[in-house]
Amino acid sequence: MVDQQQAEQIRSGSGFIAALDQSGGSTPKALALYGVGKDAYGSESEMFDLIHQMRARIAQSPAFTGDRVLGAILFEMTMDRMIDGKPSATYLWQDRRVVPFLKVDKGLEDIADGVRLMKPMPDLPALLERANAAGIFGTKMRSVIDAASPTGIAANVAQQFEIARTILAHDLIPIIEPEVTISITDKAEAEKLLLEELTKHLDALPADTQVMLKLTLPETANHYKPLVDHPAVMRVVALSGGYSRDEANARLSRNSGVIASFSRALTEGLSADQSDAAFNAQIASTIDSIHAASVAG
């Protein structure tokens, strides 16, 4: 059963969703921005220990609570670890009132027909069982759109909804994330096609079924407003997608009903060697700015 208290917080809460789900591929970059170079770890497991310390430090900072941070997206290894002596998802909800989500995709295929589809996920049912046992509320999976290709975008969205049905069958709420690359010249056209495909699939969902959408901030403000208002959509969240935090916040504030789900923009300005006071002050300032942009639209 979907937790109704958590569902209500995600559906109507005033705040944003923190993305703490850097995977193996993006972890070295995230650590480097945090001031931890490759010379600080000698193995992948040491690298993951360090990134978990960073995530735990963020989750335990005083400003990181459900008042402004409605939910947090975790990497599988984070779900399996502890924060302050409790399993991560339990800690987030019980101690911080932050709704836990799990990143479930296994990365991207090579580009074909202007898009990058998700790699196969043969272990997904087992992972979803573990997520349920851990108290996870929903999932997130990312694919990418690199061109305004009608057939490519149709295939991309179809794959997302096909896997979403498996996730829904496990009583979890899927965050569907077909990211549009911000640097492409035909971004506005790709977004037009994406809106059409998403609407088509949302219309086909059974009654009383809801999903979430995580989308690149569009070229035209309120382009995705029909999705914000769609009965099959619990919430629309935006990724920062390579925009600076200021640019992402500015774009976000022009899109009514859309809230943030930022990763890099959340950790911008944090450093491993900051004192707790400086670290917590930086996190509080960042959370304030992303929260303000999320509620401005």
Functional labels for PLM-detected ranges:
Residues 1-137, 145-150, 197-297:
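Alpha/beta catalytic barrel-like cores
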Residues 139-213:
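Eukaryote-skewed repeat-based solenoidal scaffolds used as protein-protein interaction platforms
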